Amino acid sequence: MGYVAKIVYDKDNRVTEENDAHGKIKEMRNRKRRIVAATEENKEEILKLYKIQLGREFCPWDDSYPGMKEIEFDLGRESLFVMIDGQEINADAGSKEDRIIAAISIDDDPQVERLDCWSHKLAPGAELSRLAVHPDFQNQKIARQMLVFGMEELARRGYKSVHFLVNKLNVKALRSYAVFGFDTVGECSLFGQPFLCYEKGL
């Protein structure tokens, strides 16, 4: 049986130690991550996070989308959320540097909402979209954490289901999302890419 990594959190949800694949302890005492609603002050940093995704495999985004228009649209509906990584620069002085490392939105895209594959029995439903994770923080299951948060927020707002699109060729993403038990309810071609339509009751 292979070694299972273990992460330990303190009472403030701060990672205090992590076992690597060799069983060694990695000290991470000065790091804290949290998911919060984005603010006007976050706009430029979120835009940079979006732009750094351009050119990555299976990314359908371009220079114009998503842009400041989408960020302001999401902020205006209180539907944009970010994960902040806070790491102390000087433990003695207590100074910190916060960095946005992921984002997700509750979208309202007419093209997606018009698809006839969404279940009427699970209405009202909403789309989670514009999920982005900084390349420096890939392979840490952050995308899953953002989806869990997004689904919890949708449930809090009274939605009965969540739906979103995943590139059907993106095997890594498909494997990552498989743990949630989404139903594949259809396929579509949008933004020049083939997508699977995922849906799940909340």
Locations of the language-model features?
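Conserved acetyl-CoA-binding loop-helix of GNAT-fold acetyltransferases
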Residues: 133, 139-152, 175-179
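Conserved beta-strand-loop-alpha-helix junction that forms the acyl-donor binding cleft
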Residues: 164-174, 190-194
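Conserved GNAT acetyl-CoA-binding A-motif
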Residues: 147, 154-165
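Short linear proline/tyrosine/threonine-rich motifs used for host-factor recruitment
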Residues: 15-20
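A short beta-loop-alpha structural element at the N-terminal edge
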Residues: 32-48
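Conserved acetyl-CoA-binding loop of GNAT-fold acetyltransferases
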Residues: 178-187
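Acetyl-CoA-dependent GNAT
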Residues: 51-136, 147-148
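Hydrophobic adenine-recognition pocket in adenosine-nucleotide-binding enzymes
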Residues: 38, 131-133, 166
